[in-house]
């Protein structure tokens, strides 16, 4: 004779099966989920050149003695100054990260001509592009790639 299952166990089992079919774990249903990125952090070497470059792109910034926060919409990039990332006591970082270690993609809302003009004024040499790419929005766009003064790879994607 099969063992009797409590109603609570049965309901949890059915919820888990339904969640698995729907692609979401029971833990995610019960306790929350990751909703997106808040910020990324990168070490920077050429501080003044980096500040001028990202200001030239039009990003608002907040400077502190150890970190420069560059705001991109509702997210930010924290650039760690050399005084921070070269300090052996600072451990809340990727231990082997040194400039250039970033590969970032920005969404450009404007024409390809306006982007090319801005990049030329910085100046930022286009390394590749325009090329068709699949972006984080799960649809195609046209991208160009440049490097910032530290050598981090920056992609600018224009969604169709």
Language-model segment annotations:
Residues 1-18:
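N-terminal secretory signal peptides and thylakoid transit peptides that target proteins
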Residues 44-49, 99, 103-150:
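Vicinal oxygen chelate
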Residues 42-86:
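Core segments of cupin and vicinal oxygen chelate
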Residues 82, 157-160:
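Short beta->alpha transition motifs characteristic of CBS
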Residues 36, 66, 73-75, 100-102, ...:
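Residues that flank catalytic or metal-binding motifs in active/ligand-binding sites
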Residues 28-30, 89-93:
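Short beta-strand/turn micro-motifs at beta-sheet edges
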């Amino acid at each position: 004779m099969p063992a009797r299952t409590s109603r609570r166990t049965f309901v949890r089992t059915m919820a888990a099966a339904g969640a698995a079919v729907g692609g979401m774990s029971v833990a995610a249903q019960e306790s929350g989920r990751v909703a997106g990125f808040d910020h990324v952090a990168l070490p920077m070497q050429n501080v003044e050149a980096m500040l001028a470059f990202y200001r030239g792109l039009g990003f608002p910034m907040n400077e502190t003695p150890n970190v420069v926060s560059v705001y991109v919409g509702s997210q930010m990039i924290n650039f760690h100054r050399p005084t921070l990332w070269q300090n052996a006591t600072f451990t809340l970082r990727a231990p082997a990260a040194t400039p250039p270690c970033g590969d970032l993609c920005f969404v450009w809302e404007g024409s390809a001509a306006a982007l090319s003009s801005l990049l030329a004024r910085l100046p930022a040499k286009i390394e590749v592009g325009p090329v068709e790419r699949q972006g984080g929005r799960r649809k195609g766009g046209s991208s160009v790639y440049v490097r910032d003064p530290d050598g981090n790879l920056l992609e600018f994607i224009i969604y169709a």
